[in-house]
């Protein structure tokens, strides 16, 4: 969420940032809301100060035995007391109106982010050729269904569209990928493993900016009794472990010496994919439930840019060790996520589609999420308290890594060679094949 004080100090810069995202200027509207908030607070405080002053005058009038004046003053105090709840409610409503408007506005991009409208304007940052890009091959779902180890029909009977049942060695390969990634990030990249809850509160989803903007993309979980009565949801299934990991520092004041903090988690993720109708309808690319290793960093403002590059390198290391070809692109202003100041996407090569597809997204959010969470740190040597910066990235999406391994390591007979980095996690299995695997 944006700081209204910063907007007031430089409204033109704020509007320029919005324009880069294709949005109309909003500084004047926000400043007007803030003026209304200040006026409402001033009115409530002024009435309270007047009551306090009149109370002293009542005492003086009684001391002077001026009963008539004392009665008049007491009547005025009573009137002000009656008006106080309405004035306080008006001040509260004005503050909430400003906060609600600020909460609906996306983060503004860093100066170096390329201008653009959509994914076609993203800029390649670097690439890794790995084992080389095969120009043709079967898609993952063709390979999976041929082996009998990837069952979309069974999943549809259980849960509907956009789910999958993995079996045998293919299920083990997905598990191996997740464990491999966690081990890499915790032993080589300095991340602390966390096993977070998968159900979180409204305020936690608000903190990372999933709510209120992306409410329709989420799955709400509620007790059956509440659902039957038409009540409001009490918990949300996490769309990414970014949500609980980032909120570990909500409503806290850290010491500068604690930073940076680095967390990682392997969790299921749940997304309604409300805007994905007709896209990637076959296969595992776009699922309502998928597994992902998440990376989250909490830093000082001075550390966040360097940490962004470090996080990107950590995610890239997964694909390098798997020898998978990929490229990194810097997202343009029109393609960035709501909370992001700058985002790198890692796109892995999929021979079955003959194209690169996103497998990781690494973003720096500045203090945008920290303000929503009230997450701060105390600077050394008494230099005050400031909001932390937050970063998040996929390290990486396990289901899409499985797709990439299947398509890049496929053999002419339809079997899949297990990458050497995963063989220890597969109990020595080097090839996945056949309906009985």
UniProtKB/Swiss-Prot annotation:
Substrates-to-products reaction catalysed: tRNA(Ser) + L-serine + ATP = L-seryl-tRNA(Ser) + AMP + diphosphate + H(+); tRNA(Sec) + L-serine + ATP = L-seryl-tRNA(Sec) + AMP + diphosphate + H(+)
E.C. number(s) listed in UniProt: 6.1.1.11
Coiled coil regions, renumbered to chain: none
Localization per Swiss-Prot or TrEMBL: Cytoplasm
Keywords: Aminoacyl-tRNA synthetase, ATP-binding, Cytoplasm, Ligase, Nucleotide-binding, Protein biosynthesis
EC top class named in words: ligase
GO MF annotation: an example: serine-tRNA ligase activity
InterPro entries xref list: aa-tRNA-synt_IIb, aa-tRNA-synth_II, aa-tRNA-synth_II/BPL/LPL, Ser-tRNA-ligase_type_1, Ser-tRNA-synth_1_N, SerRS_1_N_sf, SerRS_core, tRNA-bd_arm
Binding-site residues, L-serine: 240-242, 294, 394
Major localization listed first in the record, in broad terms: cytoplasm
Residues where ATP binds: 271-273, 358-361
Pfam families: Seryl_tRNA_N (PF02403), tRNA-synt_2b (PF00587)
Gene Ontology CC: cytoplasm
Pathway: Aminoacyl-tRNA biosynthesis; selenocysteinyl-tRNA(Sec) biosynthesis; L-seryl-tRNA(Sec) from L-serine and tRNA(Sec): step 1/1
SUBUNIT field: Homodimer. The tRNA molecule binds across the dimer.
Free-text comment on this protein's domains from its UniProt entry: Consists of two distinct domains, a catalytic core and a N-terminal extension that is involved in tRNA binding.
Name recorded for this polypeptide: Serine--tRNA ligase
């Amino acid at each position: 969420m944006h700081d209204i004080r910063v907007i007031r100090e430089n409204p033109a810069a704020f509007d320029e940032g919005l324009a880069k995202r294709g949005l109309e200027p909003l500084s004047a509207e926000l400043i007007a809301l803030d003026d209304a908030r200040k006026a409402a607070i001033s009115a409530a405080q002024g009435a309270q100060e007047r009551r306090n002053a009149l109370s002293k005058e009542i005492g003086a009038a009684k001391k002077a035995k001026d009963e008539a004046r004392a009665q008049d003053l007491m009547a005025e105090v009573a009137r002000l007391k009656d008006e106080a709840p309405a004035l306080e409610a008006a001040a509260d409503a004005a503050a909430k109106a400003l906060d609600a408007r600020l909460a609906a506005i996306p983060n503004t991009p860093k100066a170096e982010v390329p201008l653009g409208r959509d994914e076609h304007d993203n800029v390649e940052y670097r690439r890794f050729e790995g084992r080389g890009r095969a120009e043709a091959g079967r898609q993952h779902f063709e390979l999976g269904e041929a082996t009998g180890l990837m069952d979309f029909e069974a999943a549809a009977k259980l849960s509907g569209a956009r789910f999958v049942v993995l079996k045998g060695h293919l299920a083990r390969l997905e598990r191996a990928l997740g464990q491999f990634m966690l081990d890499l990030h915790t032993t080589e990249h300095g991340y602390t493993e966390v096993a977070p809850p998968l159900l979180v509160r409204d305020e936690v989803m608000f903190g990372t900016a999933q709510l209120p903007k992306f409410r329709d993309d989420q799955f709400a979980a509620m007790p059956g009794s509440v659902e039957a009565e038409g009540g409001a949801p009490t918990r949300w299934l996490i769309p990414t472990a970014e949500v609980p990991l980032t909120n570990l520092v909500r409503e806290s004041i850290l010491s500068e010496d604690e930073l940076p903090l680095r967390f990682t988690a392997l969790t299921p993720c749940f997304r309604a994919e409300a805007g994905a109708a007709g896209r990637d309808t076959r296969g595992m690319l776009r699922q309502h439930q998928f597994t992902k290793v998440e990376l989250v960093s909490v830093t000082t403002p001075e550390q966040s840019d360097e940490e962004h590059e470090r996080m990107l390198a950590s995610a890239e290391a997964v694909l390098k060790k798997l020898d998978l070809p990929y490229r990194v692109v810097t997202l343009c202003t029109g393609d960035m996520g709501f909370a992001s100041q700058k985002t790198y996407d890692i796109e892995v090569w999929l021979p079955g589609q003959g194209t690169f597809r996103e497998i990781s997204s690494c973003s720096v959010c500045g203090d945008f999420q920290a303000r929503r969470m009230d997450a701060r740190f105390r600077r050394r040597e008494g230099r005050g308290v400031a909001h932390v910066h937050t970063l998040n990235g996929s390290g990486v999406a396990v289901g899409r890594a499985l797709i990439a391994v299947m398509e890049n390591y496929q053999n002419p007979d339809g079997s899949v060679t297990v990458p050497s980095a995963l063989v220890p996690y597969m109990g020595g299995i080097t090839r996945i094949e056949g309906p009985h695997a």
